């Protein structure tokens, strides 16, 4: 719906299609393929910035668990939204479909979201440096999120980057596919905490 609305009057994309059905089908296909398929029937470089941003959001959310897709995963985002909704309404538990979600699951969802966001922002920053201002910033962001979510979509700027830029993109693909927590923890040594410290309240917000 969002892609159709933004591209409806764009003559280079949906605006140049002959009938309404073609526009709806092309917009729906482009939205669905952001999950992991990597196909496109519209030239992405002709799309408006708002459409590309919407596609970035879809790619960042990614596919569902146990699938071949990357990204943060749909269940992670769902748990975050439900937890935030409950917090705003003063609920102590996170409840979904009359079932209480374990606090450990909620904590893991927040951790996954935080690490994924930090990874993508870090890769985005480094690739902006490697890009050297050759391309639009939203194009660079699109490439980063597409790589992290292992979608396969692109705006054709990757060949212009140096070896360091391509290496960053490759590592981002691995992190997104394996799972960023698993990828990061594979390089770290976990240890059991033998000391439990006293709690402290910190002002938030």
Task: Describe the residue ranges of each PLM region.
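Membrane-proximal intracellular helices of multi-pass ion channels
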Residues: 4-205
């Amino acid at each position: 719906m969002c892609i159709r609305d933004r591209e409806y009057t764009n003559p280079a994309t949906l605006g140049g299609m002959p009938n309404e059905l073609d526009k709806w089908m092309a917009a729906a296909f482009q939205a669905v393929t952001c999950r992991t398929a990597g196909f496109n029937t519209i030239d992405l470089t002709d799309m408006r910035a708002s459409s590309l941003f919407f596609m970035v959001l879809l790619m960042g959310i990614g596919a569902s668990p146990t699938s071949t897709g990357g990204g943060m995963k749909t269940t992670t985002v769902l748990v975050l939204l439900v937890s935030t909704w409950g917090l705003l309404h003063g609920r102590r538990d996170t409840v979904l479909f009359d079932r209480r979600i374990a606090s450990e699951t909620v904590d893991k969802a927040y951790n996954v979201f935080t690490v994924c966001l930090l990874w993508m922002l870090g890769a985005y920053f480094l690739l902006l440096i490697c890009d050297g201002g050759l391309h639009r910033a939203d194009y660079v962001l699109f490439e980063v999120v597409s790589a992290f979510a292992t979608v396969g979509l692109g705006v054709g700027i990757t060949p212009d980057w140096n070896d360091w830029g391509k290496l960053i993109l490759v590592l981002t693909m691995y992190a997104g596919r394996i799972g960023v927590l698993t990828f990061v923890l594979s390089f770290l040594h976990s240890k059991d905490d033998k000391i439990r410290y006293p709690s402290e309240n910190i002002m938030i917000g």
